[in-house]
Amino acid sequence: AIVELSSYQLEYMVDKSSDISILLNITDDHLDRHETFERYSKIKMGIFDNIGKKIINISLKKYINSDDVKYFGYIQDTSTIIINSEKKDNLYINNDTLHYDGISLNFMGYHTLQNILAVLSVMDCLKINFAKCLTALMSFTHPPHRIELVKRSNNISWYNDSKSTNCDSTDGALKSLRQ
C-alpha cells in the first residue's frame, strides 16, 4: 500500500513501520498547530521511525545527512538528476520533459518533477525498470482539485487547485502554470 501522511497524522501514529518512506519537503507549514519549525520538522521526520529504506529530497540534505538515506532530486545549476544518491546521466530534462531511453515524459512544474523523481527512486529500490515506470506515468492525470483543468475557452484556462491550502503549495501551482 502507498500512503500519503500529513504531519497531523504522523504526530499521533504509534506504529510508523514501513518498507520504504519518502520525504518530499519540509516548509514552515502548520506552525499554528506545531508551534515551532523544529517541532514540525521532528514530527515530519518521524516518518523514518522503524522503516527499511529512507528516500529524501536532496534539498533536505541540510536537515538529514546520513549514510542510511537515499537522496533524489534535480540540481538545476548543473542539470543533474539524482536517484538514490547517484547521478543518472541517462535521465535528462529538456523543455519540461524528462527523457530516458527513448521515452519522453512531459511534466508541469518543478514540484511535479520532484514527485516523478521520488517515484523513480522507489522503483529503483524495487528493481523496477525506469522505462516501464515512465511509460506508466505517461497516462497519469492529476487527481481532482490539484491543478485540475476545468475549462478552456477563448484562450483562457480555468484550473481548480483547491488542494493548495497554504502559500507554498499555491506558489508551486502558480509556478507550474507559468511554465
Q: Where on the chain are the PLM-derived regions?
A:
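Nucleotide phosphate-binding/pyrophosphate-handling subdomain across enzymes
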Residues: 102-179
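Flexible active-site lid/hinge loop adjacent to a nucleotide/diphosphate
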Residues: 1-71, 78, 100-107
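Short intrinsically disordered, low-complexity coil segments enriched in acidic
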Residues: 1-8, 66, 76-78, 87, ...
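Beta-strand->loop->alpha-helix junctions that form or flank phosphate-binding loops
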Residues: 56-58, 68-86, 109, 134-138, ...
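Short secondary-structure boundary/capping segments
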Residues: 12-14, 46-48, 83, 147-150, ...
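Pocket-edge structural micro-motifs
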Residues: 25, 57-58, 73, 84-85, ...
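Acidic-glycine-rich active-site phosphate/pyrophosphate-binding loop
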Residues: 79-100, 143-151
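A generic structural signal for short, solvent-exposed coil/turn residues
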Residues: 2, 15, 85, 139-141, ...
